[in-house]
């Protein structure tokens, strides 16, 4: 099937230009000023087309925790949020820490409506499995407590993982950020620092950053602070926790000065009833609200569209070496998001696609929303409706 997106403005390297996009067999085949005959046409007048977002940090909860989310519902939420590719974390039940479980997750993910890849879990005794794991985004190392029981404490194990992994993604807080930077400098790997949340952590990164070290920030640390706990209570509890306004301001500054490389959701859904328990779990959903929050912030001059596409499309593809994604370019996969900067609406819990059916941003009025999401040339989300067309696992560049 061929598809033409016409009359829209397209965002290439942050520059807005008037071009039509012709898509054939899942690929962007032509960027042109002409109208090419196609099987289907989308009129994107008054709208902007950006590369589909790549969310490099999600917890779609399958296997073992599917009351909270699964690959179908999580991918529906992602598509509704303009996300066309996700990288799923390993702390499921059982955790993705050996090849058999990785294969099982690959089978389960086949129902996903957005493209997918996997982070592989590390334990104190799975180095042989880590060495054998192929086509993964990273090896995930937990140095601070979070959902699941994958936290590592043995120094030798941690060093060994760093020496035997091309890319290590870490949950490291406070001084553990500095520790992982030192370990990366002693080995030859790349380091991806997940959900940086404080000024202190940013200081460590600024001192130690090189071209093998990358830092991620989440929307909840950009848009909520510890003060929001008064109202939201457990519904704003996650790991790492919300910080001060000073920390939040430092994160925004780090986005503009290039210290932060990606924005990813850390989409970590739990059911409302679980969040109301005395021993509630930590984590918040985020796939559906990431792009609207950023587009709204853009219209308040906090961030540019160029920066949004760099941090949410281009950089994740580069960092994790995801093939043919992250740019609007001839020959690249037709993963595209059409946004309407004039569309203003309220976030409503009951309209969300995520299985948990709540958001910490419920009732927030946001201006700028994705209206159409195209995955591999297929229209998966359009005007509030989902089309269930299965996507595929990502390929990685050598």
Predicted segments with their positions:
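Histidine-rich, glycine-flanked metal-binding segment
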Residues: 1-4, 9-51, 385-387
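Metal-associated gating/positioning segment near the N- to mid-region
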Residues: 47-110
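Short, acidic/polar
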Residues: 68-75, 123-133
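Histidine/acidic residue-rich metal-binding segments in metalloenzymes
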Residues: 128-263
């Amino acid at each position: 099937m061929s598809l033409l997106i016409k009359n829209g403005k397209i965002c290439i390297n942050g520059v807005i230009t008037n071009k039509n996009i012709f898509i054939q067999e899942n690929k962007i085949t032509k960027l042109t000023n002409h109208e090419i005959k196609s099987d289907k046409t989308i009129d994107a007048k008054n709208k902007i087309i950006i590369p589909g977002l790549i969310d490099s940090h999600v917890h779609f909860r399958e296997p073992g925790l599917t009351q909270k989310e699964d690959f179908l519902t999580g991918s529906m939420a992602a598509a509704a949020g303009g996300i066309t590719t996700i990288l799923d974390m390993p702390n499921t039940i059982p955790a993705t820490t050996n090849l058999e479980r990785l294969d099982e997750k690959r089978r389960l993910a086949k129902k996903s409506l957005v493209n997918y890849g996997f982070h592989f879990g590390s334990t104190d005794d799975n180095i042989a499995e880590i060495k054998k794991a192929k086509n993964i985004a990273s090896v995930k190392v937990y140095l601070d407590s979070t959902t699941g029981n994958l936290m590592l404490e043995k120094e030798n194990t941690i060093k060994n993982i760093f020496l035997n992994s091309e890319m290590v993604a870490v949950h490291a807080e406070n001084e553990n950020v500095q520790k992982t930077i030192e370990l990366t400098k002693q080995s030859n790997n790349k380091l991806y620092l997940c959900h940086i949340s404080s000024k202190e952590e940013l200081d460590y990164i600024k001192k130690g950053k090189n071209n093998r070290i990358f830092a991620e920030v989440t929307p909840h640390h950009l848009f909520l602070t510890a003060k929001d706990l008064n109202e939201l209570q457990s519904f704003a509890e996650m790991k790492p926790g919300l910080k001060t306004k000073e920390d939040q301001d430092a994160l925004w500054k780090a986005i503009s000065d290039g210290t932060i490389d990606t924005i990813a959701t850390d989409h970590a859904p739990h059911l409302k009833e679980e969040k109301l328990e005395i021993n509630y779990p930590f984590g918040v959903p985020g796939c559906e609200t990431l792009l609207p929050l950023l587009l709204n912030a853009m219209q308040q001059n906090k961030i540019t569209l160029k920066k949004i596409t760099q941090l949410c499309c281009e950089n994740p593809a580069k960092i994790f070496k995801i093939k043919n994604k992250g740019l609007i370019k001839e020959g690249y996969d037709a993963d595209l998001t059409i946004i309407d900067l004039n569309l203003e609406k309220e976030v409503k819990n009951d309209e969300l696609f995520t299985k948990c059916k709540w958001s910490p941003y419920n009732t927030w009025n946001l201006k700028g929303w994705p209206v159409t999401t195209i995955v591999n040339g297929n229209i998966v989300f359009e005007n509030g409706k989902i089309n269930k067309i299965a996507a595929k696992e990502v390929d990685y560049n050598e």
